[in-house]
Curated annotation (Swiss-Prot):
Keywords linked to the UniProt accession: ATP synthesis, Cell inner membrane, Cell membrane, CF(1), Hydrogen ion transport, Ion transport, Membrane, Transport
Gene from which this protein is expressed: atpH
Entry-linked InterPro entries: ATP_synth_OSCP/delta_N_sf, ATPase_OSCP/d_CS, ATPase_OSCP/dsu
Function (record text): F(1)F(0) ATP synthase produces ATP from ADP in the presence of a proton or sodium gradient. F-type ATPases consist of two structural domains, F(1) containing the extramembraneous catalytic core and F(0) containing the membrane proton channel, linked together by a central stalk and a peripheral stalk. During catalysis, ATP synthesis in the catalytic domain of F(1) is coupled via a rotary mechanism of the central stalk subunits to proton translocation. This protein is part of the stalk that links CF(0) to CF(1). It either transmits conformational changes from CF(0) to CF(1) or is implicated in proton conduction.
GO molecular function: proton-transporting ATP synthase activity, rotational mechanism
An annotated GO cellular component: plasma membrane
Assembly notes: F-type ATPases have 2 components, F(1) - the catalytic core - and F(0) - the membrane proton channel. F(1) has five subunits: alpha(3), beta(3), gamma(1), delta(1), epsilon(1). F(0) has three main subunits: a(1), b(2) and c(10-14). The alpha and beta chains form an alternating ring which encloses part of the gamma chain. F(1) is attached to F(0) by a central stalk formed by the gamma and epsilon chains, while a peripheral stalk is formed by the delta and b chains.
Chief localization: membrane
SUPFAM superfamilies documented for this protein: N-terminal domain of the delta subunit of the F1F0-ATP synthase
Name by which UniProt lists this protein: ATP synthase subunit delta
UniProt family annotation: Belongs to the ATPase delta chain family.
Pfam families tied to this protein: OSCP (PF00213)
Keyword GTP-binding recorded: no
Length: 186
């Protein structure tokens, strides 16, 4: 695979690249990406699963056994199941969220797209998401895949991350900036 121009590096980048190359060789990139997205959604929805992958208290065997049960229940097998088990054996589960993000970026780049992570104060409608994709496409010059997460603490607005660039139009950030400006004056 040609070296990508993205900023993906480190442990997560190496694991993600290896998984992508295997998925590409077997023609299963979209299946692998779908399984990774499902696992990511499970992670976001379960504090216990987050604790399992982040806590050094669990031994590799305990993590592997618990992860195996989770993967079996979620019917995640094949490349992604084997990949996550390998990551657990190598004591790298803490980096799985970054690995998933890196895989998505690599897959998007291979499709001629770029990946954007959007954090919004409220859920976006299909129309808003479509308009956001169009606006981002006009800026980056490529089709954009968008992963939207909701964070009510932003109050209003968006935080958009594309590659190493971030645009923060959230009300929370604007209020914090105003607060700092008022402290400097007073």
């Amino acid at each position: 695979m040609a070296q990508s121009g993205s900023m993906i590096s480190g442990v997560a980048g190496r694991y993600a690249r290896s998984l992508f190359e295997l998925a590409q060789e077997t023609g299963a990139v979209s299946v692998v990406e779908g399984d990774l997205v499902r696992f990511e959604e499970m992670l976001e929805g379960s504090e216990d699963l987050k604790r399992l992958i982040k806590s050094p208290v669990f031994s590799a065997d305990e993590q592997l056994k618990a992860l195996g049960a989770v993967l079996d229940r979620a019917r995640i097998s094949g490349l992604v199941g084997n990949f996550l088990r390998l990551v657990a054996r190598n004591r790298r589960l803490f980096a799985v969220p970054q690995m998933i993000r890196a895989f998505r970026e690599i897959a998007a780049e291979a499709r001629g797209e770029t990946a954007a992570e959007v954090t919004s104060a409220h859920a976006l409608s299909a129309e808003q998401e479509r308009e956001l994709k169009a606006a981002l496409k006009s800026v980056v010059g490529k089709d954009v895949t968008v992963k939207v997460t909701v964070d009510p603490s932003l109050l209003a607005g968006l935080i958009v991350k594309v590659g190493s660039r971030q645009i923060d139009t959230s009300l929370k950030t604007k209020l914090n900036s105003l607060k700092l400006a008022l402290k400097e004056v007073g």
